[in-house]
């Protein structure tokens, strides 16, 4: 606890250097992957707790367990987590809570719920991270496991509860710096590496006939559908913000017109020796408009950026497969012609 207090005192507001990288045990990764894929079959969001410890600037994740899934509102999830960690402590297993994990569908991990949950975790447990596992991308052969932490600017903005455009400009917060990605490393014990080497020798050699498979239209279709939905949401947010700006502009115009009229009337009163009317009487008639919440639009912009990156990456891979397949087909036809 003393080490945590010292690290907290040394941290600056401008940069978050609490954690440099995350080291995850292979068994913990397998537990997360198994849980996320089981819940993805039911189209549910998988979430769980991460256990481990902090060594210098490295967050070591050595174990994890899923959050309870129950429709009973009387169930105390916090008590459940404390009970699990208490029992792990009895069997001499790392029981310190260092974060949480959740599954992701087609890369759509950034959300209001994720931001709020990580804020509460990071303000109560300084070193905590959120690990996001993309089930669909991993099922295609690309292990997608990423660790994130809220940036100091995002924490300050959420702590102030001010999500107006002025607050975003002052803190220089955008969708690209709400979260900071922390490098994650998977580590196995020497015995595990030996066993995996032996299993690798027992596995049959892959012929590689699926490497050039182009029948992945459903992946692109899901990404495009999600992208269209997010663009539509961002358009609605833009319409609301434009209406707010129009109302503010109209109010400012009327306010300046009223102040100009009052100034002319006060000039007449001054020439007649009568007392002038203070400008506060006019200003009180125009109450300041409440600025709309821009956090939703920022998160939606981040989701659009993520989908666009995934689509670009997927299309580049598909084009590469297409050109390679074309070259192989031409070579095959030339060989058969001989």
From Swiss-Prot:
Every MPN domain range: 22-154
Gene3D superfamilies, alphabetized: Cytidine Deaminase, domain 2
Pfam families according to UniProt: eIF3h_C, JAB
Disulfide bridge positions per record: none
Keyword ATP-binding: no
GO CC terms of this entry: eukaryotic 43S preinitiation complex; eukaryotic 48S preinitiation complex; eukaryotic translation initiation factor 3 complex
The keyword Cytoplasm is annotated on this UniProt entry: yes
Gene Ontology terms for molecular function: metallopeptidase activity; translation initiation factor activity
SMART domains (alphabetical): JAB_MPN
Subcellular location: Cytoplasm
Taxonomic superkingdom: Eukaryota
InterPro entries: eIF3h, eIF3h_C, JAMM/MPN+_dom, JAMM_MPN+_peptidase_M67A, MPN
Main location: cytoplasm
UniProt similarity note: Belongs to the eIF-3 subunit H family.
Function: Component of the eukaryotic translation initiation factor 3 (eIF-3) complex, which is involved in protein synthesis of a specialized repertoire of mRNAs and, together with other initiation factors, stimulates binding of mRNA and methionyl-tRNAi to the 40S ribosome. The eIF-3 complex specifically targets and initiates translation of a subset of mRNAs involved in cell proliferation.
Protein species of origin: Drosophila sechellia (Fruit fly)
Biological process (GO), any one: positive regulation of Notch signaling pathway
Keywords (A to Z) from UniProt: Cytoplasm, Initiation factor, Protein biosynthesis
HAMAP family named in the record: eIF3h
Oligomer and partners: Component of the eukaryotic translation initiation factor 3 (eIF-3) complex. The eIF-3 complex interacts with pix. Interacts with mxt.
Name of the protein: Eukaryotic translation initiation factor 3 subunit H
Organism classification: Eukaryota, Metazoa, Ecdysozoa, Arthropoda, Hexapoda
């Amino acid at each position: 606890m003393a080490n945590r207090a010292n690290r907290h005192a040394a941290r600056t507001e401008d940069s978050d250097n609490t954690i440099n990288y995350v080291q995850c045990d292979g068994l913990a990764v397998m537990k997360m992957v198994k849980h996320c894929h089981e819940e993805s079959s039911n189209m549910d969001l998988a979430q769980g707790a991460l256990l481990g410890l902090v060594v210098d600037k490295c967050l070591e994740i050595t174990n994890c367990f899923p959050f309870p899934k129950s429709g009973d509102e009387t169930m105390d999830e916090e008590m459940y987590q404390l009970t699990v960690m208490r029992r792990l402590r009895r069997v001499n297993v790392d029981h310190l809570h260092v974060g949480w994990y959740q599954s992701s569908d087609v890369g759509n991990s950034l959300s209001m719920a994720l931001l709020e949950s990580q804020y509460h975790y990071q303000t109560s447990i300084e070193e905590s991270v959120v690990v996001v596992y993309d089930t669909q991308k991993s099922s295609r052969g690309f292990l997608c496991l990423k660790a994130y932490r809220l940036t100091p600017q995002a924490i300050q903005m959420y702590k102030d509860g001010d999500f107006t455009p002025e607050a975003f400009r002052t803190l220089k917060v955008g969708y690209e710096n709400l979260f900071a990605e922390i490098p994650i490393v998977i580590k196995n014990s020497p015995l595990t590496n030996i066993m995996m080497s032996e299993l690798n020798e027992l596995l049959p050699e892959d012929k590689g006939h699926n490497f050039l498979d182009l029948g992945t239209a459903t992946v692109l279709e899901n990404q495009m559908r999600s992208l269209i939905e997010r663009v539509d949401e961002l358009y609605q947010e833009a319409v609301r913000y434009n209406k707010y700006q129009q109302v503010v502009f109209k109010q400012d115009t009327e306010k300046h017109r009223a102040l100009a009229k009052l100034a002319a009337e006060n000039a007449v009163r001054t020439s007649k020796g009568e007392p002038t009317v203070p400008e506060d009487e006019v200003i009180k008639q125009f109450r300041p408009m409440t600025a709309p919440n821009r956090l939703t639009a920022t998160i939606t912009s981040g989701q659009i950026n993520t989908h666009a990156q995934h689509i670009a990456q997927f299309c580049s891979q598909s084009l590469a497969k297409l050109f390679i397949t074309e070259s192989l087909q031409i070579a095959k036809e030339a060989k058969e012609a001989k």
